[in-house]
């Protein structure tokens, strides 16, 4: 026959002293404050350090604003260096006198080039609208500006009325009657004077 050891009666706990109560309260408050600070830190990180889409690269969403302006994935606008494309609402005339939407066509061609991917731009200066003026490239298109001029979707554009960097490409497009050269058109600079921006 086995006998069990008798349980010793528990000694009554002594009541906490004021100092012990204050210490426990301080520990609880310290933990609460730490949790609140962590939450505040998380909110601040989310607000001020949230993910920004890349300006360029494989995951960037690069779009055309018109025939010579690109909006990068981070929202920065780039005007393509050395060219002047028909304005978005500008029309041109075919050789037979028929009107066509050359401004929309220039934007569509730029969009097609951008869809090739691997777009990058190297800023050279800023224009009066605070856009960066940049030489841009895309997959298989080392110089987007030159490509647009060579295909007749933009004009060579230099300072003042001087020749820009793509005069040879423009001469080629004009001789082959590509794009706007297949009929008649107002130079984009003249069209802007005749149709001022409302902003």
Identify the meaning behind each predicted range.
Residues 2-199:
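Small beta-barrel nucleic-acid-binding modules, primarily SNase/OB-fold domains
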């Amino acid at each position: 026959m086995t006998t069990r050891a008798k349980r010793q009666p528990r000694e009554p706990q002594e009541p906490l002293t004021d100092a012990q109560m204050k210490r426990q309260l301080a520990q609880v408050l310290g933990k609460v404050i730490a949790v609140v600070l962590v939450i505040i830190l998380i909110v601040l990180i989310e607000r001020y350090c949230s993910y920004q889409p890349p300006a360029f690269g494989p995951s960037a969403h690069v779009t055309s604003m018109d025939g010579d302006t690109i909006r990068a994935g981070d929202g920065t606008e780039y005007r393509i260096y050395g060219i002047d494309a028909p304005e978005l609402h500008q029309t041109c005339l075919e050789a037979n006198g028929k009107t066509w939407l050359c401004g929309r066509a220039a934007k569509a061609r730029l969009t097609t080039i951008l869809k090739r991917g691997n777009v990058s731009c190297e800023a050279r200066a800023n224009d009066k609208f605070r856009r960066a003026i940049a030489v841009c490239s895309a997959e298989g298109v080392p110089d987007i500006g030159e490509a647009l001029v060579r295909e007749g979707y933009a004009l060579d554009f230099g300072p003042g009325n001087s020749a820009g960097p793509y005069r040879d490409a423009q001469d080629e497009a004009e001789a082959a009657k590509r794009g706007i050269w297949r009929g008649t058109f107002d130079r984009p600079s003249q069209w802007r004077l005749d149709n001022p921006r409302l902003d």
